[in-house]
Amino acid sequence: MATTIDQAFVRQFEREVHASYQRMGSKLRQTVRSKGDVKGASTVFQKVGKGIAATKSRNAQVPVMDLVHDNETCYLEDYYAGDWIDKLDELKTNIDERQVIANAGAYALGRKTDELIIRELDKSTNYAGDDATGLDLEKVLEAFEALGEKDVPDDGQRYAVVGWKQWTELLAVKEFASADYVGADELPFRGTQAKKWLGTMWIPHSGLTLGAGDVRLCHWYHKSAIGHAAGSDVETDISWHGDRAAHFVNNMMSQGAVIIDPDGVVTMRCDETPA
């Protein structure tokens, strides 16, 4: 077995990992503000307050809104997803096998991306309803109202991420699952990855925090409320280790997340205790 790896193969494998990460690795990265190619260990997301328009008299100065300018710092950390491969030469000739290994690394990095975003969403203290019930229409409408009261834009960039238990509970809500309310094109049965309802893209996710008392933290938020930053795209390093007679494939990525505007996040605490 060769102990050196052709660099063209390494670059091709790296591209496959990156493509898999972009396509399937993270469910939530596209739902938040995202920065790429960040230089250094941190970056800043700007936040601007609300402005109020006013009149002015003839020849008077235009009134100044005195907007409050604030920012949130996002700190990046390095994350790795590596594995040992005894027969790397097989990857060069077996496309299916190579894609399996590439996907494994990409999905691991994608899960970490979602974990970072969820960790920031969990900082929300804007709760809709109590934590003694599951996800029902009443709790959904209370969260919807809370977003409106905070003037969160209803501009097509709202997202709601819920657990699979809550997704099945929503399927029992006729306003969510019936074509009479949402139209045939928006029925959740056409695809379980996401569904639009109440001007919001609803996404089921298996990685949401399950806290004490089997309470799942589900979140409804605006894209601008959470920031994600990446220092670089997915990188891959392949090295030979003679003591193991194997190659080590390491996929790595520098990234971080931060909550920018807590008012843009409403959390629905949902009880998953068996009835």
Place the predicted regions along the sequence by residue.
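N-terminal "assembly arms/tails" that initiate or stabilize quaternary assembly
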Residues: 1-74, 265-273
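Short acidic, glycine/tyrosine-flanked loop/strand segments centered on an H-E-D-like triad
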Residues: 69-91
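Extended, compositionally biased alpha-helical segments that mediate assembly or anchoring
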Residues: 238-275
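Alpha-helical scaffold segments that mediate packing/assembly in large oligomeric complexes
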Residues: 86-152, 267-275
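Glycine/small-residue-rich hydrophobic helix-like segments
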Residues: 191-240
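Extended, solvent-exposed, turn-rich assembly/linker loops in the middle of proteins
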Residues: 123-193
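Short helix/loop capping segments that flank catalytic or ligand/cofactor-binding pockets
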Residues: 53-56, 169-172, 258-260
